[in-house]
Amino acid sequence: MRGPGVGSGLSGERGLSGKEAGADTEVAELLPFLVPGARADLQAAAAQHVLALTGVGSGRTLLAGQTALLRALIDLAVAPIPAPSRDASRALVNLAADPDLHWQMLAADPELPVRLLRCVLDPQWPWAEELAAVLANLSREPAPCAVLTEKLVAAEPERLGLERLVSALCMPSYNASAPLHYLGPLLSNLSQQAEVRAFLLDPDRCVVQRLLPLTQYTDSSVRRGGVVGTLRNCCFEHRHHKWLLGPQVDILPFLLLPLAGPEEFSEEEMEELPVDLQYLSPDKQREPDADIRKMLIEAIMLLTATAPGRKQVRDQGAYLILRELYAWESEPDVRMACEKLIQVLIGDEPEVGMENLLEVQVPEDVERQLQELDQQEQQELAQERRDKGAPRT
């Protein structure tokens, strides 16, 4: 395969080897053109070729385990213009989208997370969005996510860690050349780690309060979904529920508002709702992304894990919003999640000693039965989705 627009090949004497060539030959031909000091036009063509390879599974397999080439690609991605850092960055996005390559990328450069984050958090870096996507992809799997978290926590004293990441996420104008929407899913993935949740839920930092307005961020479902996923993960920490639901944070209206539609309520019902959910305009739209709607419901469900949480969610009229959502919802799995939450809100309280649903010890035989029921439910939902998409006869 020849580099795009290079005529007879990168070296001027021989062309790039084809996909069918062995990995050793491929790396031998590509690597000299990717390293610093290579001629600019040949370096650009080599980066384009690697980008093309990363677009298909066979190409990613070809590159897998080639430590020197991966390291050169990483160096190129963080190199200043005029280096072809954009193509190198996009190649890293594709590589990081393959979970099987995460460890190879981290092995090629153990400092990869910090190096990429340094560019992502540079307000002048033109390809910061691509590198944010690399970090978001890398952090999807638990083990690489833990490694990434360790690096970010270690970088915190230099303000290259979580605090600066949150600041950039909460400031859409942070980088005029890059929207940084992928900081949303990056933070969501990182918040699977206990250390990150502890940072986010630190009352002295006011991080959660800064994230809440982004549940209504209309310019990007990627950013919005990442923030909602982060908030949902924070809701697993039931010891913070009182603070989250209390006046210092007041999280519930921010979770309910995207689920609310234009439906009218009686005056009596209206008084049950938080002020922000009263008298909504007739053109009020619900969250358009089904996955985000489900995460919002899941976050509220987690807040009902304790008896005080259930009471506060009930007292703020959540049932009214969910009742109308259930009547409107067409996605089977979201509708099922909504139904389960409604059942918690209208059902009887658990018996003494079982008030905290996150701490209840479930016997193994009951757990197996629940897993079987869950599998059956998932099969029914899958069938419902298939039936929904089937052409009419």
Swiss-Prot record:
Keywords: Phosphoprotein
Phosphoserine modification, residue list: 221
Ranges of Gly residues composition bias in the record: 1-12
Positions with biased composition (Basic and acidic residues): 382-393
Region (Disordered): 1-21, 374-393
Keyword Phosphoprotein: yes
InterPro entries recorded: ARM-like, ARM-type_fold, Hgh1, Protein_HGH1_C, Protein_HGH1_N
Family: Belongs to the HGH1 family.
UniProt-recorded name of the protein: Protein HGH1 homolog
Naturally occurring in which organism (per UniProt): Rattus norvegicus (Rat)
Underlying gene: Hgh1
